[in-house]
Amino acid sequence: MNDQVWLTLAKKINELLKRPDIDGIVITHGTDTMEETAYFLNLTVKSNKPVVLVGAMRPSTALSADGPLNLYNAVVTAAAKESKDKGVLVAMNGLILGAQSTVKMNTVDVQTFQAPNSGALGYVLNGKVFYNQVTLKKHTTQSVFDVTHLNALPKVGIVYSYSNIEADMVTPMLNNGYKGIIHAGVGNGNIHQNIFPVLTDARQKGILVVRSSRVPTGPTLSLIHI
């Protein structure tokens, strides 16, 4: 998966959803980067019609393959009128998850996709869709992002912090065309003293630096500024 595939996919989805004979779209996707694709589409699809991503954790030859039911549930979700205006969705193992909160939590478990910060939006049971909540986050038609005329995306890198991180892990990003750096810090997005000067240099060079956390739940508070 890469930016070019994402841009092509978003543009094609927007084109298809303009047709009155199409009520929703289901996208089969590998589970490794499904959450990334879902979130990208959640910000770039310009329709209130359902877009549902689905995959499988087990191969089709497994004794209890999860793919067939996941696909069925995804189609049911995309076809349900209740799924409109809920943003891009992920349908896995009976749950319906909002793209903005979907996280892959386990390497092999069929219940790997969860929403630890907000919970699932709903579920599918016996071919029927049930919603318990909606997201208040801006998405799709409310999003400020428009990729209609874009052929490439800015180059952004991720710095994963740890106890002994050194500045040379970050320095190459300052001179190789990066427009942004995401810092996955410890705790509340805290920045190691060894790389703080380099990230400060990045800001002075016009590179955007965004603090986040490697911790899976909870917000990252604005305690420091670079």
Task: Pin down the residues of each PLM region.
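Short Gly/Thr/Asp-enriched flexible loops that form oxyanion-binding sites at enzyme active sites
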Residues: 27-49, 191-200
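Short, acidic/small-residue loops that bind anionic groups at enzyme active sites
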Residues: 37-69, 76-79, 204-213
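ATP/NTP phosphate-donor binding region
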Residues: 1-16, 197
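Accessory alpha-helical/coil subdomains and C-terminal extensions
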Residues: 98-183, 188
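CN hydrolase (nitrilase-like) catalytic-core segments centered on the catalytic cysteine
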Residues: 182, 186-222
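Short acidic, glycine-rich surface-loop motifs adjacent to enzyme active sites
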Residues: 19-34, 176-188
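Conserved small/polar residues in nucleotide/adenosyl-binding loops
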Residues: 224-226
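Internal gly/pro-rich beta-alpha loop/helix module
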Residues: 53-125
